[in-house]
């Protein structure tokens, strides 16, 4: 309807979102480390759900851009306080599994987003799709405020909360002094670069190069998000299971699954077999979602009680600045640059140029981070 270019689509889903997401993430995490985390989440959920619905009234690129900025500001206050609450309920040996279960909510959201969004777009248009996806979140925010209790900080580990939250500079200095965190945060950022970049343009790849309608594609991608949820859970579960004997598994699990992911995703980009490619997205979704929970769990294990929301925000700042900020934009830019030569095939070759190198780069940093995990955990606040 608006005739947006790949670069504009990349900006909407990537850089414009990321710059506000990361800018508001840290102050909202600071608020969560000092205030009631449940209320921070409820207010944030109301904002991003409302702005998602408002997107349905956009008349041009600028309107969509402003709505996406509103969504970004709201979402910035969601995960860090939620991660901190989960880490207070579950101890170090259970934490990755618990965070993985929480993180499957992302995949459930993708499931309903693709499933409802694809079919609603086909029959009623994209404007109605935004309204249907956005409005239920407001009701959920009210339920969260009324029905969910705020857990005591340090509850699972019987740690004493002294009530004072360190300053951002202190938390950042603490984390960056740990070599394991330096490398895992870079690995996560590049991982997200691949995930957001490829994920944002995968629907375009199928719609342009395969004979498939948006409703059917939405159903397939929704189902693949279920596999992503399985991968998220298994990443956390395996890390906790294997990490009891050797904490380096909290980095080896993301490293190994990332490497296994690569040949399968290359097959998706290269094949002309539509349904075989769609089925392969189940495998890639499962493998590439295994990274998040182990990295969140190990990050929380490296810091004190009132650093947890902030540590999540710092990790998400790096992850989203690199991943969401540049992933979709770079792939969209490369696609536009080679479009005069490759035409509608340009998105295929843009993915083939960018994704393999980035995937290998990410796995390398996971392996390096694993070398320092045991020593850094010994230095964690007791």
Spans of features found by a protein language model:
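Helix-breaking motifs and short loop linkers at transmembrane-helix boundaries and internal kinks
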Residues: 3, 36, 57-63, 74, ...
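Central cavity-lining transmembrane alpha-helices of secondary-active solute carriers
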Residues: 14-28, 222-235
């Amino acid at each position: 309807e608006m005739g947006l270019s790949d670069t504009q689509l990349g900006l909407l889903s990537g850089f414009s979102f990321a710059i506000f997401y990361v800018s508001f993430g840290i102050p909202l995490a600071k608020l969560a480390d000092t205030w009631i985390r449940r209320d921070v989440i409820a207010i944030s959920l109301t904002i991003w759900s409302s702005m998602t619905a408002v997107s349905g009234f956009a008349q041009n690129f600028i309107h969509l851009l402003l709505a996406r900025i509103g969504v970004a500001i709201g979402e910035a206050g969601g995960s860090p306080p939620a991660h901190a609450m989960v880490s207070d309920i579950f101890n170090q040996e259970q934490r990755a599994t618990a965070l993985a279960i929480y993180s499957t909510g992302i995949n459930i959201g993708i499931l309903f987003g693709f499933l409802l969004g694809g079919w609603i777009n086909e029959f009623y248009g994209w404007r109605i799709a935004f309204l249907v996806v956005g409005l239920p979140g407001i009701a959920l925010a009210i339920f969260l405020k009324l029905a969910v209790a705020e857990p005591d900080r340090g509850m699972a580990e019987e740690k004493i909360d002294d009530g004072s939250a360190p300053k951002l500079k202190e938390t950042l200095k603490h984390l960056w002094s740990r070599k394991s965190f330096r490398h895992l945060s870079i690995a996560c950022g590049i991982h997200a670069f691949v995930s957001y970049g490829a994920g944002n343009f995968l629907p375009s790849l199928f719609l342009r190069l395969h004979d498939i309608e948006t409703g059917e594609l939405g159903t397939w991608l929704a189902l693949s998000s279920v596999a992503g949820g399985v991968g998220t859970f298994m990443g956390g579960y395996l890390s906790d299971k294997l990490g009891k004997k050797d904490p380096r598994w909290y980095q080896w699990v993301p490293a190994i699954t990332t490497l296994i992911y690569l040949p399968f995703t290359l097959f998706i980009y290269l094949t002309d077999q539509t349904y075989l490619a769609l089925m392969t997205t189940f495998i890639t979704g499962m493998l590439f979602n295994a990274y998040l929970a182990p990295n969140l769990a190990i990050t929380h294990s490296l810091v004190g009680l009132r650093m947890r929301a902030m540590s999540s925000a710092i990790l998400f700042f790096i992850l989203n600045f690199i991943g969401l900020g540049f992933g979709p934009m770079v792939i969209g830019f490369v696609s536009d640059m080679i479009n005069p030569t490759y035409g509608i095939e340009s998105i295929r070759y843009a993915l083939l140029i960018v994704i393999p190198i980035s995937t290998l780069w990410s796995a390398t940093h996971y392996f390096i981070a694993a070398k320092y995990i045991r020593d850094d955990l010994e230095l964690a606040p007791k």
